[in-house]
Amino acid sequence: MEKNQNPNTWSDLPLDLLNLVFKRLSFANFRQAKSVCSSWYSASKQSVPKNQIPWLMLFPKDKNNNKNSSCTIFFNPEDKDQLYQTQDLGVEFAKSVCLATYGSWLLMQDSKYNLYILNPFTYEKIGLPAIESQQVGMVKVDQTIDDDFLTFDDHNHVKLFKGNNTVRTPVFWIDEKTKEYIALWGLGYWCVVYAKNGDKLWNQIPEIILDSLDMVYKDHKLYSFSYRNLFTILDFSGEIPRKAFQCFMHVYRSEWLSPRSRQLSNSWCVAETKLVVTVTGDVLLVERMLRHWSRIQSFNVYKFYSSGTFLDKYELADSLGDEAMLLDLGITVLANEVEGLHRNTIYFSDSHDTTTKDLFLFNYETREMEPLHKFDFDCSLLELSARWFLPSFSHT
């Protein structure tokens, strides 16, 4: 039988076909495929990995003693044998704290408490107005020589905030292509402020939201609930925010026991109360429960807002269905659309005294914590701050 003198090879696959292949690959498989040959590498430049499983960022806990400026580690649960580490992002990044994430972008606060948005994969950086640069409104802010902040309301009431306690419940959104963005945070207990592209000052939202216990920004809407038991939805689709919904709600908040009682007690405490917006737009109230002595955690999930209606009686959810909850982001995603993502599971990070041994998922069906992964790297990085995020990737 005569041999085919012109056999087709992997390198000869049409570009259109390669593009279809690349669009279906996860991040780990995408990285492997682009290294097959030069033609595949060229084709990969016209594609990006599909929207995938959430990643976990691991930051050193002690920023003051962090002399390694390239120490942030990324863990992809889909590719458990591989840890990714950023290149040198500079001393400023090493001394900064991550406050929130959106896509591949991080909202950071540096050692002088200045805010900026950073993409650790492309190294793009967007500066934000200084905290004390506030639009004339109900609150005035001055920075002290110790980098703390004095706030004055319109009745001349004064309150001192330590620098790292001034920015509360921060959230942001950014368009990956146009870099249009909005950043929002609670100014102490006074009000909520926001800034968009080109703003030199933070805009105060007068009287609508006076303080914030937690906030979620999704689909140009800000969801907030406050220490005053107010649940509010603000619509940011126009030039100025518009109140779309507001009502009183009951939030159970348990005060921490005294240090001595805390050591002796192993009863459940409400360690954190969070808002979560589902795929369909329902709003959930999530209580993270903690047995302090044993460090065992559990979660209660309540539905209290659905289809534009506030539910007088909160419904305790017995299941998350086919969705997975990303508690750090305040959202749920469909697990069956993301390979490797577990349905009916809560992905969370504990910002207090976290080590690699304390990273778990919570299976809402079995009501049990499951270890995320057995990490194996330099013990100098074991004291960590961890945060989940949903990266998206450009043509790199």
Curated annotation (Swiss-Prot):
It comes from Arabidopsis thaliana. This is Putative F-box protein At4g22660. Gene3D superfamilies: 1.20.1280.50. Residues 7-58 form the F-box domain. It comes from the Eukaryota. InterPro entries: F-box-like_dom_sf, F-box_BR-signaling, F-box_dom, KIB1-4_b-propeller. Pfam families: Beta-prop_KIB1-4, F-box.
